[in-house]
Amino acid sequence: MLSILSIAALLIATVQAADFSSSCPIDSPISCSSNGDTSNSCCYENPGGIILFTQFWDYNPASGPADSFTIHSIWNDYCSGGYPQFCDTSLEIDSTGSTIESIVVDQFGDQTLYDNMNKYWTDINGNNKKFWAHEFNKHGTCLNTLNPSCYSNYKQNENVYDYYSLVYQLFQKLPTYQWLVSAGIKPSTTATYTLSQIQSALKSKFGAEVYIACDSNNAINEVWYFYNIKGSILQQNYLPIDTVSKTNCPSSGIKFPPKGNSGANTLTTKTTGTTTSGSGSTSVPATSYINLTGKSGCLISNGKYYTSGTCATYHFNAGSSGNTQITSSKGNCGIDSSNQFTCSSSTSATDFQVSGGSIGYNGNFDWCLGAVTGSGSTAQTSVKLSDGSCSSFKLTLSS
């Protein structure tokens, strides 16, 4: 028998869905499509019409249950590439996350959601609330169909609660760990898998090609699911589409380490590309932000310098002859014909050197600022190898 709380939660969800079903027409257009009435910003996600749901496999240090991936976030990409972030400061919540429990539990009475967030939406450094606040401020404020103006009877913080509820509801529909295990892909300190095996296992359940990210040990690190969406995101009419990002994983030899296992006896080292039997640490992390010495800001996913917003997470993989290859969500990172650091799906894998926490290319560890695009807080500046004629700095790794 359903508990009183369960019945109440079901009624709330039903009323909310009915409210938005009546607000948005049945023939609401699909995001990234020009068919239908695309003028209603409360019933059409635009221009960020590609919806991503992303999950982590944090095995060392371990985060979340041993038999589950954990939540990263929901966010939207532009249909033409790139993504919005921190779209409306007036909608942001306290960056420490100090108000989230009060919103979810005290204001909206959803202790179950809050408990599940603490179980499955975990920060690797243990600061869950700050992580959740960051994700809402960066991504939740960019979902135009979640804007308070779209609610017929808006209650304060309702969009915040709905964002966290939507994230967890979609997570429940994407049991990545169970899908992999059912296909014979199980956490192991010795077994490896092919990219085709992993992609096929997930595609057979999801219905479209999924993005797989690997760390520098060639171990599964993250999984991204891509959608278009019909109508308001609150209606949850998600339409799976193939990934628009290029994997950084090898075609074979991909590892799926059990959580809590360092993998030191079986995983490839980050510095030499060889196998170690010890537990000694290596100097290049699996993932990192890239900062500029003496400057605020950091590099974003296309390789440009940005003074506001959030730093991109870069992945570091063993290259040839002890070098390191770098990737971002945009693809491989390399040096273009103008000696600029760049990352894209069309960039070839490039060998960099990482020494003392700094990044170099062909022995040159000095970098300079180049051309600027945009203006003000949205300005992006290219970063290029120093030729000795400019004020140089180092590109350094940071967590």
Curated annotation (Swiss-Prot):
PROSITE patterns: RNASE_T2_2 (PS00531). Residues 262-279 have a biased composition (Low complexity). Residues 259-279 are annotated as: Disordered. GO terms for cellular component: extracellular region; vacuolar lumen. It comes from the Eukaryota. The keyword Secreted does not apply. Residues 1-17 form the signal peptide. Disulfide bonds join 24-43, 32-79, 42-150, 87-142, 214-249. Its EC number is 4.6.1.19. InterPro entries: Ribonuclease_T2_eukaryotic, RNase_T2-like, RNase_T2-like_sf, RNase_T2_His_AS_2. Keywords: Cytoplasm, Disulfide bond, Endonuclease, Glycoprotein, Hydrolase, Lyase, Nuclease, Signal, Vacuole. Pfam families: Ribonuclease_T2 (PF00445), RNaseT2L_C (PF25488). GO terms for molecular function: ribonuclease T2 activity; RNA binding; RNA endonuclease activity. It is found in: Vacuole lumen; Cytoplasm. Glycans are attached at residue 291. GO terms for biological process: RNA catabolic process. The active site is at 72, 135, 139. Its main location: other. It catalyses: a ribonucleotidyl-ribonucleotide-RNA + H2O = a 3'-end 3'-phospho-ribonucleotide-RNA + a 5'-end dephospho-ribonucleoside-RNA + H(+). Rnase which modulates cell survival under stress conditions. Released from the vacuole to the cytoplasm during stress to promote tRNA and rRNA cleavage and to activate separately a downstream pathway that promotes cell death. Involved in cell size, vacuolar morphology and growth at high temperatures and high salt concentration. Belongs to the RNase T2 family. This is Ribonuclease T2-like 1-A. It comes from Candida albicans (strain SC5314 / ATCC MYA-2876).
